[in-house]
Amino acid sequence: GEETYMNWKKTAALVLASVFILGGCSEKREQAQQMLAQAKEENRHEATTFAMDTIMTFTVYHEDGEQIMTDAEQEIRRLERLLSVTMEDSEIAQLNANAGKQAVPVSEDTMYLLKTAKEMDELTNGCYDMTISPVVKAWGFTEEEHHVPTQAELDALMPLVDNDSVILSEEDQTAYLAKEGMAVDLGGIAKGYTSDAVTKLMKEEGVESALIWLGGNISAIGNKPDGNPWKIAVENPLNTEDYVGLVEV
């Protein structure tokens, strides 16, 4: 009857009101998300530097982004001064210069990477060997004067490729290369380690969204400001202007 009809009208009115309220909430939520993304975009900071023989770029979303990127670059420079094979006063350069002569003191960072490199040599059955440096140098890769060494040159250098002759003393915090002419090069893992260190630093400084690109070593913090994952293009080695795929991180 009439009472049932009135109850139905009240119910319909409540349902419609709920729809409008929910719709309004949804719209406001979307607006709030857009405003948040815009605010984060305004806090976007970018920087490019050259270190460890490669170009490095940072994209950081944080109100103190400029200072954070300065701190990140200082950390990179600190590690470069320890691990570089080309800087004459680096710990690695000093270790190489004293091969077959004496042990040299090293920092915790350098000791950790030397230990890791020795472990990787064992895990890969010698496929990764930091003592390959004299052979790499013979090809001219480190001096931009590429040439093909003779078999006699390579045969003379191969005895220096000897991971077991890298002697580490954690007690004394020293490293020693047992054969004169030996040299180590941590280039295969140093930038990855540096990327991890920079990522840790940025997180400690409150960064929740960033992309760190150290040559071919890429690290991401959180997602992009709009909530989507970072997309990394994998370069086509046969055509550097093209890519073979995308990886979401």
Predicted features and spans:
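Mature catalytic core of soluble alpha/beta enzymes
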Residues: 2, 7-249
